[in-house]
Amino acid sequence: SSSILSYVTVVQAVHIRKRPAQTNDMLPAHGTQTFTEDGTFTVPASVHKILITACGGGGGGKSISGGWGADYIVKRAFSVEPNAVIPITVGKGGLGQDANSDPEIEATDGGTTIIGNLITISGGFKGGDNTRIHKGTKGGEDTVFAIAGLQGTSSGGSSGSTGGQGGGACFGNGGDGGTNGKYTIGKDATNGGTGAGGGGRAQRVGNSSSSYSKAGNGGDGIVIIEW
């Protein structure tokens, strides 16, 4: 009986330590930050990996040809250091050709999106050069072909041509091409969505002169960072 009492005494003397409850400060942070303009991203404390979705700027429409869509990545993982500051450059959409402005606005390629030293994403080519192969450098082994802007379609005879649609992108549709009215130029081409190419202009050819609509601008790029 004395041994039983001793056992009970020992058990009662044991101090059971409870595991402390986890607080928000002890848990890894989670969130999303979107950039449509240049800026900086500060990696939250305790975060060692981020997911990036991003694209360059779409190319502007040129002549009757739509601009190219930009290169893009979707939820690609990158290793980072906590509290690191990463500069972000968001590629701007290229300008669409406008022969009616003074001076004339020439079409331009879409801008490049740069995310620190992690990745560089090419913008789309301007329209009018669909023979080029657009191959974006994504870092590592990945290579994605951009979607080319469609060539403008002829409206037949000597009346001229409607504009081609801009090349699409992961985030937006290409701009619509300019249109021809019965006797005059119709609507201007529209701008591309995010990262997409602008539509090509319409052109009408007369006996003594020609008239043109405005080609669409490419859409600006975007950067979305998740952690």
Where is each model-derived feature located?
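Low-complexity, intrinsically disordered segments with a bias for serine/threonine
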Residues: 5-10, 158-165
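Extended low-polarity, hydrophobic cluster-rich segments
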Residues: 13, 73-75, 170-171
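Glycine-rich strand-loop-strand elements at beta-sheet edges
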Residues: 34-37, 54-117, 131-134, 198-224
